[in-house]
Amino acid sequence: MALAAPAPALTIAPIGDGGIADVIALWQRCGLTRPWNDPAADIALTRRGANSTILISRDGGAIIATAMVGHDGHRGWVYYVAVDPDRRGKGHGRAIMNAAEEWLRQAGIAKMQLMVRSDNTRVQAFYESIGYDEQERILYAKWLDGRERTP
């Protein structure tokens, strides 16, 4: 009788030099990229800062989830939360968010915030299911390089 090989361990760790193209491909597959934001530039900027990182969840060697996390010394923010669409509903989103929260706790940050597009009701339900609540805020933005407004 042959025994099945054990499933590869899930790991969550900060992004390294490898896998950047795979991370961008995952973000694109999840619909997170926008024409006005270069994801490679976002990754490079995040990796340069001491107050930010990109957490990567791997199943064996495959990147299955990400979260870009950072803080301003007072509040934490999370962006680019992505889970491989073929692996959703298995706890990977919860795991990567737990890791992002822990990263901020270790930095002494007591509150984490995130932004969700108003039409993305599926992800709104996910965040509510893990303890986040909608805040009564209005977000203002302005391009400082003269670009036209973006949605």
Where are these regions (language model features)?
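A short beta-loop-alpha structural element at the N-terminal edge
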Residues: 9-23
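A short helix-loop-beta-strand connector motif used in the catalytic cores of GNAT acetyltransferases and
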Residues: 45-56, 77
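Conserved beta-strand in the GNAT
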Residues: 56, 62-70, 77-82
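A short, internal acetyl-CoA/4′-phosphopantetheine-binding micro-motif in the GNAT/acyltransferase core
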Residues: 81-88, 116-117
